[in-house]
């Protein structure tokens, strides 16, 4: 039996020692060159020939996509930067305030599969242009809502989800079709730097524009103008690359889209995709909760410590904590994303499971520091900021790595759909409900104590401690991902190269390339 496991498999030539056929560089992992577990990476000329774009143009496209990603997150967290003012203006409690983020995320979550389906089949550039133009108009409209119509603010924040859904499900797949291997990882890290930087700029812009204008409504009027510029850049700079071409062998036929139902079944049978999405869900839960509630929590901490006056109806609330938290978010995001990508890149040389293991380490490491940040807030605001800095840095290590995992375990014609359903899962169980849940728990706890500024602080403090527990669960999901990552990556590479085709609802069949040569294949590496 041991001999049969390494016998020539699917041979079309008499010479068992022949290498791969011309135009078919070594197969991935054990099916090709045993010295390399990666696809052969095209050089600059090869990428230019395949994509029809120069390296400079491809890099410029990534810069434009990064700018729009930054803008999306800047808009999302501008609201958090003026959250206390919104509470006072509309005279609402913590539960209703949490609904602002929940409604937006719910809309985003519902629309993501729609744009995922369209993004795998139609021109991605025009889909993004339309979505971002609509988002800019709705965001501008939300800044003119009178105080008696809070429901209208919720409606407009929900419609903002159209723009984010049209962009977030599609943009990473464009990067995947422009670059491969380490080049792709580097470009994804640049793209995902925009998330923490944009989030931090949202806090800063929201608080500072409010201070300068004397009215929080003006904070919501900054990003729509920048959105118009984003649409122009998309239209003039971005070009649609062929899907999956940079990963195919020169002799392999292009992949054709399958039905939406077939895509869903294939993704559900991909344990690396499912488990990494669950791990990312915990990241979304924690970041969504902190994004909305951390500035308010820090303000309440300062009030309890006697460092700032309380925010009373009719008064302008202190914006210093929004500014500081925004700066921390920017710095920790850049540091965390960069550290995560670099550590993972170095560890991959020795361990092919490095990506999920780094993600697990980041989440498991962040949990105790977030707990300490909350526990110390009653005694020292400086210690709280230090622990938040460390916790958010570890948490940010996941962003680019999770995106890279999805792109190499899912075939190109399913990537937008996979992005969409990762968004649905991470928001459905993550930040769609976490801000509202934290606010609801805070309200319930506060009602059980005598009214005071201390009870407001303690209620939010105890409710936010849920984040540390959820972060630990996410770390466990990434440890599970590490068990399957090698096999799922190899399967996706075989599909792209035309060596593994689906023939039924649950079976895969190996097909011989048209110019097939004798190849020694461990059967155990194929029948997975």
From Swiss-Prot:
Keyword Magnesium attributed: no
Q: How does it sit in the membrane?
A: Multi-pass membrane protein
Q: Could you list this entry's UniProt keywords, alphabetically sorted.
A: Acetylation, Lipid transport, Lysosome, Membrane, Phosphoprotein, Transmembrane, Transmembrane helix, Transport
Q: Coiled-coil ranges per the record? A: none
Q: Which residues carry this modification: Phosphoserine?
A: 518
Functional description taken from the UniProt entry: Plays a critical role in the phospholipid salvage pathway from lysosomes to the cytosol. Mediates the rate-limiting, proton-dependent, lysosomal efflux of lysophospholipids, which can then be reacylated by acyltransferases in the endoplasmic reticulum to form phospholipids. Selective for zwitterionic headgroups such as lysophosphatidylcholine (LPC) and lysophosphatidylethanolamine (LPE), can also transport lysophosphatidylglycerol (LPG), but not other anionic lysophospholipids, sphingosine, nor sphingomyelin.
User: To which protein family does this belong?
Assistant: Belongs to the major facilitator superfamily. Spinster (TC 2.A.1.49) family.
Q: What is this protein called?
A: Protein spinster homolog 1
Specify the species: Mus musculus
Print the organism lineage.
Eukaryota, Metazoa, Chordata, Craniata, Vertebrata
Q: Tell me the gene name.
A: Spns1
